[in-house]
């Protein structure tokens, strides 16, 4: 031991266990523009004060450990430690608190969502002093945002590539999701694209199974794309799922898609992982491919209100990691999604600058400093009667994706696509004429049925279908 170390240790080191709040709860701290800010929903164990719980989160997700260690004296903890700088009670919840934590930027590797999450949502979520812990929101500072490429292309570049403006894009997930041969799969793709859809999609668990290997699927889907483009005069695409068991295999599939000349590939970003996703996003930008992102596994992480991570955080992470589309719920369909909360993270996906708005679950003002935006995808249990609400809720910069709502049409796949396209065009025209889609939506659809027997048949099939279940993850203060 050197004399310098020995002297410092003799006056500054005291072995033992300290309360976290002595070092990591700093209500006087003024946050910096370069700090990453986090809002955690903390549920302390009985007998643990909220200040101690918040400080424990700050410590265990940054520089702290359970006891004082000698090597604390070899660095500047004041420079590197996370700080719990504010705690507030959650309305209507006696045992829950929002703990705000500031992290110095130097704690994180540049351009790495993987490293950021390993710290902020790592081992701390298993900490015994906490009964539950949920990350509600993150503020990503411009200094860190600028280290990421972000989406391969973004909303405006995608519209320019497709030459489609002034309306939402239309998609369809091919069903049944598993079991079709590659040729029959390609036939369904062709029929949907010919009928008027912009995109069709591999389901998230379509990779390369014995009944349909990936290369065969890619070839038949490419044939469907080119044939439908020739017949309609519109640019078409199919989300070819490149997700695979290894990053090398994923890239092989993306390269083959590029060689086929198709416009877009797909990745399951949570099951595939952020490192793989960021690599694929970089490849897509370099090679002119759009990237569709599916969020399979998200509800394991985000559905419970008191533990895990809200989807708005996963949405921000995806915008950093890279993707041109991401599934975002529907509000009106079969999947979980509170309206105000959904609109909040939809804005976080699309807009350059989003103000703090607790009524929509947004805890921090977020400045994306020109990072390209991501198109939200509404998908899951939607049909033609939902079209006015979807158009009103999501606006033009979105993808409305109907699986069963296309392929379940009584006359077949192409008429199902026609019905959706007619319904969308009717809603966009009515909106542009100043009509209120929220009030007149059903009337607008009925009027369009007079000119489209395909739409009339679809309306008859799905007139009674609803998904009336309460939302589990509501915003605080809602009954």
Curated annotation (Swiss-Prot):
Record's comment on post-translational modification: The disulfide bond which can form in the large chain dimeric partners within the hexadecamer appears to be associated with oxidative stress and protein turnover.
Miscellaneous comment text of the record: The basic functional RuBisCO is composed of a large chain homodimer in a 'head-to-tail' conformation. In form I RuBisCO this homodimer is arranged in a barrel-like tetramer with the small subunits forming a tetrameric 'cap' on each end of the 'barrel'.
Main location: plastid
Amino acids binding substrate: 123, 173, 177, 295, 327, 379
InterPro entries: RuBisCO, RuBisCo_large_chain_AS, RuBisCO_lsu_C, RuBisCO_lsu_C_sf, RuBisCO_lsu_fd_N, RuBisCO_lsu_N_sf, RuBisCO_lsuI
A Pfam entry, by short name: RuBisCO_large
Required cofactor(s): Mg(2+)
Subunit: Heterohexadecamer of 8 large chains and 8 small chains; disulfide-linked. The disulfide link is formed within the large subunit homodimers.
Cofactor binding: number and manner: Binds 1 Mg(2+) ion per subunit.
Subcellular location(s) per record: Plastid, Chloroplast
Location of the active site: 175, 294
Residues recorded as bearing Phosphothreonine in the entry: 330
SUPFAM superfamilies hit by this protein: RuBisCo, C-terminal domain (SSF51649), RuBisCO, large subunit, small (N-terminal) domain (SSF54966)
GO MF term list: magnesium ion binding; monooxygenase activity; ribulose-bisphosphate carboxylase activity
UniProt protein name: Ribulose bisphosphate carboxylase large chain
A GO CC term attached to the entry: chloroplast
Name of encoding gene: rbcL
Residues with site note (Transition state stabilizer): 334
Alphabetical list of NCBIfam families matching this protein: PRK04208.1
Keyword Oxidoreductase: yes
Keywords (A to Z) from UniProt: Calvin cycle, Carbon dioxide fixation, Chloroplast, Disulfide bond, Lyase, Magnesium, Metal-binding, Monooxygenase, Oxidoreductase, Phosphoprotein, Photorespiration, Photosynthesis, Plastid
Family note: Belongs to the RuBisCO large chain family. Type I subfamily.
Presence of keyword Nucleus: no
Residue positions where Phosphoserine is found in the record: 208
Catalytic reaction equation(s): 2 (2R)-3-phosphoglycerate + 2 H(+) = D-ribulose 1,5-bisphosphate + CO2 + H2O; D-ribulose 1,5-bisphosphate + O2 = 2-phosphoglycolate + (2R)-3-phosphoglycerate + 2 H(+)
EC number(s) on file: 4.1.1.39
